[in-house]
UniProtKB/Swiss-Prot annotation:
Pathway: Amino-acid biosynthesis; L-proline biosynthesis; L-glutamate 5-semialdehyde from L-glutamate: step 2/2. Belongs to the gamma-glutamyl phosphate reductase family. Transmembrane segments: none annotated. This is Gamma-glutamyl phosphate reductase. It comes from Roseiflexus sp. (strain RS-1). CDD domains: ALDH_F18-19_ProA-GPR. One of its GO terms (biological process) is L-proline biosynthetic process. SUPFAM superfamilies: ALDH-like (SSF53720). The gene is proA. One of its GO terms (molecular function) is glutamate-5-semialdehyde dehydrogenase activity. GO terms for cellular component: cytoplasm.
Length: 423
């Protein structure tokens, strides 16, 4: 039987050691993990465990898309190894000194970046997350307790054994990365209440998982990765930009959190924009759910296809994660901002040549990332120059947007004196 208290205690002890690990040793551990992932014997063990999970998933009637996310191959293991090596090459944030000053009384003060401590990560049927999270937590000096979806229990256990064997060879504690491999859901609730040992919980999955964690946790929870993404096409838009940006945001990877869900178009340019957008997206099998004004424009332009349907009010505010796009014609910037304020918080973009309008949009939209003349798909740690990410936070505390190495740290005040006493 899995003892969550014991796992937590071991993680806390390992976290104290990890906080003191030099960068060179952490990097060596990541290189060892990467090497192990492409070692023939290790890979065979992981792939065998994964094959059992995948077969069970097929027998349970899981969707082809979910089966694909669950599946590991030698090529995917090689890609995970490459990603792990990329984390090793990133700058180590731990120990960074900033906001240094000397006070009038001569005290020397600075902030020093430190690991969060023990990070609990709960995720669904993506075994690659096991290694991604381990790499980021180790590099940032944290310990981690992992709980993957019940569909990938064997895969997660095999990957964790590989990680533990690799890191102990370089002097890191095996307990720095632990996995809860018992599918009992009650153990998740126990983890969410393990505030004696765990410093933060990061869920990676659907809205139901995020809600469950927020409701049950006695530990701070950083949620994100879910949200409705918008593009607003302004009356001053460069029309040549519109189709490529909308296509990229909607079609490139429709099942991810930074994919476009709703297109808002200024009525002054709607008759020019919508037919061009529709032609492009229909060719990629996108279903368009158009409001009354947008539907009229498309009908007048000769579009008559079951792929274009009248939008219901419920189609706005939906994260589709599929080849579906809702479209609304708006009277101008103010209406677009009101719509985004109601439904947005993840990734929202404006297409315009008017710098003043763009600045109003950037200031007014309260989302984790705001884009001007660029696709929402750039809300990603790698794309924003941060390297890998553990999640994309839509919260305002403690982190917002892509959570990379720096976001897995906090800081402490360091005060140095020369026998100072307070008057």
């Amino acid at each position: 039987m899995t003892n969550i208290e014991e796992i937590g205690a071991r993680a806390r002890a390992a976290g104290r050691r990890m906080a003191l690990m030099p960068t060179e040793r952490k990097n060596a551990a990541l290189e060892a993990i990467a090497t192990a992932l492409i070692d023939e014997a290790n890979a065979a063990e992981v792939l065998a465990a994964n094959a059992i999970d995948v077969a069970a998933g097929r027998d349970a009637g899981l969707s082809p898309a979910l089966i694909d996310r669950m599946t590991l191959t030698p090529q995917r293991l090689a890609a995970i190894a490459a990603d792990t090596r990329a984390v090793a090459r990133l700058p180590d944030p731990v120990g960074e000194r900033f906001d240094a000053t000397v006070l009038e009384n001569g005290l020397r003060v600075h902030k020093r970046r430190v690991p969060l401590g023990v990070v609990g990560v709960i995720y669904e049927a993506r075994p690659n997350v096991t290694v991604d999270v381990a790499a980021l937590c180790l590099k940032s000096g944290n310990a981690a307790i992992l709980r993957g979806g019940k569909e990938i229990t064997r895969s997660c256990a095999a990957l964790t054994r590989l990680i533990q064997n690799a890191i102990t060879q370089t002097g890191l504690p095996a307990d720095a990365i632990q996995v809860i491999d018992d599918p009992d859901r009650a153990l998740v609730e126990q983890l969410l209440r393990l505030d004696r040992y765990v410093d933060v919980i990061i869920p990676r999955g659907g809205a139901g998982l995020h809600r469950f964690c927020r409701e049950k946790a006695t530990i701070p929870v950083i949620t994100g990765g879910i949200g409705v993404c918008h593009i607003y096409v302004d009356q001053a838009a460069d029309l040549e930009m519109v189709v490529p940006i909308v296509h990229n945001a909607k079609v490139q990877r429709p099942s991810v959190c930074n994919a476009l869900d709703t297109l808002l178009v200024h009525r002054a340019v709607a008759a020019d924009v919508l037919p061009a957008v529709a032609r492009d997206l229909l060719a990629s099998n996108v279903e368009l759910r158009a409001d009354e004004a947008a539907l009229a424009i498309l009908r007048d332009a000769g579009f008559d296809t079951p792929q274009i349907v009248p939008a219901q009010e419920s189609d706005f505010g939906v994260e589709f994660m599929a080849l579906i796009l809702s479209i609304r014609v708006v009277s101008g910037l103010d209406e677009a901002l009101d719509h985004i304020a109601r439904f947005g918080d993840h990734s929202d973009a404006i297409i315009t040549r008017d710098a003043a309008t763009a600045e109003v949009f950037v200031q007014a939209v309260d989302s984790s990332a705001v884009f001007v003349n660029a696709s929402t798909r750039f809300n990603d740690g790698g794309q924003l120059g941060l390297g890998a990410e553990i999640a994309i936070s839509t919260q305002k505390l403690h982190a917002r947007g892509p959570m990379a190495l720096r976001e897995l740290t906090s800081y402490k005040w360091v005060v140095e004196g020369d026998g100072h006493v307070r008057a």
